Amino acid sequence: MGLKAGIVGLPNVGKSTIFNALTKSAIPAENYPFCTIDPNVGIVEVPDKRLADIAAIFNPKAITPATVEFVDIAGLVRGASKGEGLGNQFLSHIRDVDAVLHVVRSFEEDNITHVEGSLDPVRDIETIETELLIRDIASVDKRLEKLQKNARMGDKDAKKELLVIDIVFPKMNEGILVHDIELTSDQRLLIKPLSLLTDKPTLYVANVDENEIMSEQRSVGLQKLFDFAEERGNAAIRLCGKLEAEISNLQDEERVFFLEEYN
């Protein structure tokens, strides 16, 4: 059983650094926008002690752990749907993911360019989600024409799906993300094949500096991000991508010592 997660965010927020930490890869993570162009894919086994305990009882020929496949795509910018930056065509690479990891820059660093010119995690989240929503609107618009044609021909399934689209599409055009639109579980199931990006479970990953990660209390800016996540109904975590990447490259004994030092 495997889970697939797509990593999104603005350029220079640490997506590739975090991808490297998660997958123990060594893809370039440079200080310039669009360092990542082609998608990077890494598969990670999920440790589970219960699996080892069960194997000890039944002694199977092979043990197959659960996996997570991470897909790191190029950074999106404001106006990507209109061709800004590298555009949004590479969003097709995460269309079939089960969840979205939205990496948000939450650290100050003069030597690392911020494409928006200043640090504002909530603004950056809204920028990315707007671009994802515009992509979803285009997907629904394309599907709508076919549904209407099939419904006129008496296709019952098309009629059912069309009823849901008639609820969802106007709200999307008002700027409402799909997962924020009130639908029954059956209605949401009908539009699942569309693989809409703003309908997927989303985790905000606040990429912070070492001082922030060592602090028990969140900074004012970081707290705003967590409050925003709660309003959205999404989860949020903080981590230091740079530190995690360093830890992932250590030998097991060194890693234990390092983690103890950083508590």
Report residues per predicted region.
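C-terminal-of-GTPase-core extension/linker across diverse P-loop GTPases
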Residues: 2-8, 13, 19, 146-263
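Conserved G1/Walker A P-loop phosphate-binding module
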Residues: 1-113, 142, 147
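Signal for well-folded cores of large energy- and translation-related assemblies
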Residues: 23, 27, 55, 59, ...
